[in-house]
C-alpha cells in the first residue's frame, strides 16, 4: 500500500502567501519562505506553490523565491504559475523545484504537456485542474485563469474528458481543485473525486474543502486519492499536521514518517 501525502498549498500573489474563498476575496497570510520552512518542520510531506495571477497576467511565476525555498526545506515542492514553455519549466526546476504544475497554459496549448513529459520526464509534470460543478447542466466544467476574478472563464472541456486528455499526453500527477468547495471548509467533493478516480491512472491529489480532520479521512478512504491538499485549515492553525497524521494512521490510512525526502510509512512504500 502506498503512503498518502498531506500537502499544504501556498497561493502566492505579489510576493505574499494569500488565501481566498472559492477563488475570491484573498487575504494576506504571510511571507513565502518562512511559511514554507514552518510547514516543512511541521510534518508536511510536500508543498505546492501557486503564483495565482501569473497566467492571467501573462507572465511566468516569480522565480526569486524558488531558490530560497529550496535552501530551507528538505521535502519535495511543486511550483505553478504561467509556465508556458519547456524553458520556463527548466528554469524553475534548475532553481530547486521538484515538480512544475501547469493549468491554464495546458488548456491553451495541450501540446505543452507532451513537450514537458518528453524533456523532463513524467514525474515532474503535474496538471492542475480547476473544476466547477454546474448545477444547471449537472456537469463538471474546467475553468481557466481562476487567479483573476475578472478573467476567469469556462474552457471548452468537461472535467472527465480533460482528465483523459492530459493523461494521454503524459501527465504524471493531477491536482483536482474543486471550485465549489474551495475555502468553505465543508469537506472535499468526494463524489466528484470518486468519478475522477475511476478514470485517473496517475496519482490524484484532492484540493478544496478541507475543514476538519474527518474530511481528510473521508477523502482518502472513500475516493482513494493519493494526497490531500489544503490551505486555510493549516494557515489558520485549525488543524495540526502531526495530529492529522496520527488520526489518519489510527483510521487505517498509511502515512509517511517525518524523515524528509526519505520518509516512509511503517510497512508501506513511500
Curated annotation (Swiss-Prot):
Subcellular compartments: Cytoplasm
SUPFAM superfamilies: Ribulose-phoshate binding barrel
A Pfam entry, by short name: His_biosynth
Keywords: Amino-acid biosynthesis, Cytoplasm, Histidine biosynthesis, Lyase
Pathway(s) it belongs to: Amino-acid biosynthesis; L-histidine biosynthesis; L-histidine from 5-phospho-alpha-D-ribose 1-diphosphate: step 5/9
Active site: 11, 130
EC number(s) reported in the record: 4.3.2.10
Catalytic activity of the protein: 5-[(5-phospho-1-deoxy-D-ribulos-1-ylimino)methylamino]-1-(5-phospho-beta-D-ribosyl)imidazole-4-carboxamide + L-glutamine = D-erythro-1-(imidazol-4-yl)glycerol 3-phosphate + 5-amino-1-(5-phospho-beta-D-ribosyl)imidazole-4-carboxamide + L-glutamate + H(+)
Catalytic class of the enzyme: lyase
Gene3D superfamilies according to UniProt: Aldolase class I (3.20.20.70)
Gene Ontology CC annotations of this record: cytoplasm
Molecular-function GO terms, alphabetical: imidazoleglycerol-phosphate synthase activity; lyase activity
GO biological process, one term: L-histidine biosynthetic process
InterPro entries: Aldolase_TIM, His_biosynth, HisF, IGPS_HisA/HisF, RibuloseP-bd_barrel
Its biological purpose: IGPS catalyzes the conversion of PRFAR and glutamine to IGP, AICAR and glutamate. The HisF subunit catalyzes the cyclization activity that produces IGP and AICAR from PRFAR using the ammonia provided by the HisH subunit.
Family named by the database record: Belongs to the HisA/HisF family.
NCBIfam families in the cross-refs: hisF
Subunit structure: Heterodimer of HisH and HisF.
Protein name: Imidazole glycerol phosphate synthase subunit HisF
Gene name of this polypeptide: hisF
